[in-house]
Design a protein with these regions (language model features):
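Conserved structural elements of the adenylate-forming
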Residues: 1-2, 132, 151-172
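Conserved AMP-binding/adenylate-forming
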Residues: 3-49, 183
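Short hydrophobic alpha-helices that are characteristic scaffold elements of the AMP-binding
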Residues: 32-38, 60, 188, 199-200
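Short beta->alpha connector loops at strand-helix junctions that form conserved
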Residues: 45-47, 69, 209
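ANL superfamily adenylate-forming
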Residues: 72-132
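Conserved pre-ATP/AMP-binding loop-to-beta segment of ANL
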Residues: 118-140, 147, 173-179
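Conserved AMP-binding/adenylation subdomain of ANL enzymes
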Residues: 159-179, 186-217
Length: 217
């Protein structure tokens, strides 16, 4: 609730798009749930995305808010933020981005602090107003064959995917008492679906993104 309140305090409306540019980490999942609790739509961006890919996804999705992981990520996106004249610094850009916060620069703490004036009831209203048919996320391809292509996924789509995993033998990993290490990019549908299944199924999840330390001897 506290992080969702921060988004609401920043003027995020029901159905607004919020971009999330980060490698796999705990804050990624926290922000994803907070975006949904605020009634908004998450727009994951691969941490390895190029400048042109980031610009395209921000413009195409209509994201009004973004959370990055590192200073390098923020630098790639900063020229897309609207200036005082209501236009982005990047000439010719159609970006609608109003603000960027950075995970490594206390984004979570900032959102919690800014959301303090918001009542729990306002978050409850956003949650109750969200229907299964509503858009939950715009998921883009990695862009290996051209511009990243966006896929519109509703809350019903995610619930169906999670139900399929939990009713499959693979669903055993999501049972209470199980422990799962999530290390694949959460911008990828399968990794995110498994992550959601673990959360809903009652398992315990850890996040990691340093592939060099995941080798098996």
């Amino acid at each position: 609730y506290e992080v969702a309140k921060g988004f609401i305090a920043n003027g995020v409306q029901q159905g607004d798009r919020i971009a999330l540019l980060s490698e796999t980490r705990y804050e990624w999942s926290l922000l994803d749930f907070a975006i949904w609790a605020a009634g908004a739509v998450s727009v994951p961006i691969y941490g390895s995305s190029s400048l042109s890919q980031i610009e395209w996804i921000i413009e195409d999705s209509g994201a009004v808010f973004a959370v990055t992981e590192t200073r390098e990520h923020t630098e790639l996106m900063k020229n897309l933020v609207l200036g005082e004249d209501g236009k982005p610094l990047l000439h010719g850009s159609t970006s609608q981005l109003r603000r960027i916060l950075e995970i490594n620069a206390s984004a979570i703490a900032t959102l919690k602090f800014e959301g303090r004036p918001i009542d729990d009831d306002q978050v409850d209203e956003r949650i109750h107003a969200t229907k299964s048919r509503d858009l939950a996320s715009l998921v883009y391809t990695s862009g290996t064959t051209g511009r990243p292509k966006g896929c519109r996924l509703t809350h019903a789509n995610w619930l169906s995917e999670v139900h399929g995993l939990l009713t499959n033998p693979m669903g055993a990993i999501a049972r209470p008492g199980s422990r799962v290490l999530t290390f694949l990019p959460l911008a990828h549908v399968l990794s995110r679906a498994v992550s959601l299944a673990v959360a809903i199924g009652g398992g315990t999840q850890s996040h990691w993104s340093n592939f060099s330390t995941l080798g098996v001897e």
